[in-house]
Structures are given as structure tokens and as C-alpha cells.
Amino acid sequence: ATELGVNKLSFVRMDNSGKQKIQIPRLEKIVKTASKQCGRTNFPSLKEYDSLKDFLYLNNAKTIAAHKSGDRFLSTFLFKNKMKPSSVIIGPEGDFSKEELSLIQQNNIPIISLGNRRLRSETAGVYALTSINEYYLNKN
């Protein structure tokens, strides 16, 4: 994500997230190394949230969510909508809970599809970032 120009990485504890604690100091070292390798002079900030509800309450970014129930592909969404997303919610390996999906819908967050294959969370994030970057680079 650092090499793709992300300004902020948010780690959200989801209902179906694994038990492991996010190691922010370790991730900061990785981000700094990746930034230096790709020639970035600024480093993305890292933020941890205890729940999706906290993230949605404290985050004012234009947000979309990636889920298999999405009724349109990311590329179609980008082409047909004027909203330029600045935040993408990627579910955990265990998927969003019913409550989290309901919360996303209640907040009118568009749910998009990343394709027909089930992707690992890390892969889904890179895929979404790459697709959004590619779309806006080619648009200009």
C-alpha cells in the first residue's frame, strides 16, 4: 500500500478478525522501509480502531466497502459514479459479520465487488488500490 501512494492505513478490529494484536511499531518500520525504497519522502500514518462502528464514526472519508454481495464491480462503480473514494473497507479473512454489513448499509456506504474469486484480505486491498490508482491515472 505504501508503494501505491496511500496516505493512511487503518486497521479495524472486526467481529471475525483473528485474535492477534496489530503490532503498530513493527508496521511503522515496514512502512518507513517501503517508503524509502519507492522514493517517498512522507510516510503513511497508521491508525487502529477497536470496531467498524468506531472507524465509521471517526472517519470522514468517502468510503466504499468490498464484499462478495456487491452488485457492481469496482471498475463499473468508478466509471459510473462521481464519488472519488478515498477509503476502502476490506473485510477480515472471516468475512464481515451480519451486523457489520448492516452497519455499512445503514451508513449508505456503496458495496462493490472485486470479482468472482474470494480474495485474501491483503490481496483484496492491493487489488482495490491498484484498480483505483489505474482508473484515475488513465482518466487524467
Residue locations for each model-derived region?
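Short, glycine/charged-enriched secondary-structure capping and boundary segments
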Residues: I24-R26, L78-N81, S102-I104, Y127
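Residue-level recognition of oxygen-bearing side chains
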Residues: S51, D95, A124
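Structured adenosyl-cofactor binding patch, chiefly the S-adenosyl-L-methionine
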Residues: K98-N140
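Glycine- and other small-residue-rich loops at beta-strand/loop junctions that grip anionic moieties
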Residues: Q20, E93, R117, S121
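A short acidic, often aromatic-flanked loop/helix-cap motif at beta-alpha or helix-coil junctions
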Residues: S51-Y57, D71-F73, L119
